[in-house]
Swiss-Prot record:
Listed GO CC annotations: cytosol
InterPro entries attached to this UniProt entry: AsnC-type_HTH_dom, Dimeric_a/b-barrel, Tscrpt_reg_AsnC-like, Tscrpt_reg_AsnC/Lrp_C, WH-like_DNA-bd_sf, WH_DNA-bd_sf
Key word Repressor present: yes
Pfam families noted in UniProt: AsnC_trans_reg (PF01037), HTH_24 (PF13412)
Domain of life of the source: Bacteria
Keywords of this entry: DNA-binding, Repressor, Transcription, Transcription regulation
Purpose: Negative regulation of glyA transcription and kinB-dependent sporulation.
MF annotations from Gene Ontology: sequence-specific DNA binding
PANTHER family in alphabetical order: HTH-TYPE TRANSCRIPTIONAL REGULATOR LRPB (PTHR30154:SF55), LEUCINE-RESPONSIVE REGULATORY PROTEIN (PTHR30154)
Domain HTH asnC-type: 2-63
SUPFAM superfamilies: Dimeric alpha+beta barrel, Winged helix' DNA-binding domain
The keyword Repressor is assigned to this record: yes
Name of the featured protein: HTH-type transcriptional regulator LrpA
Amino acid sequence: MIDEIDKKILDELSKNSRLTMKKLGEKVHLTAPATASRVVKLIDNGIIKGCSIEVNQVKLGFSIHAFLNIYIEKIHHQPYLAFIETQDNYVINNYKVSGDGCYLLECKFPSNEVLDQFLNDLNKHANYKVSIVIGK
């Protein structure tokens, strides 16, 4: 079980996972060693699974951010999954979902032409509905 201080630590690390233990401790009113001990405990208990960065895909040349609802009418999804594994340049996440569709695919593309080619290739394995991200 976690307490209010642990919740504050998680909140601060969610905002900036690069905080030093000293700065984090100041924000939650603990010493750096006490803060580090709590962070280690959160990691050991599996509450913190890792620290990550947020990549600016536009600066890397991927100006199109899209979500695709994937619809597969066949029982076997392996051809679709095999195709997705070959598309790691464009696929950010592939979530198996319930509700509308079988999968929710998050992708990035450098141009409409590349998106169009991806959709043509995808259509050999599944039907889809595309939503383009306008803003965050």
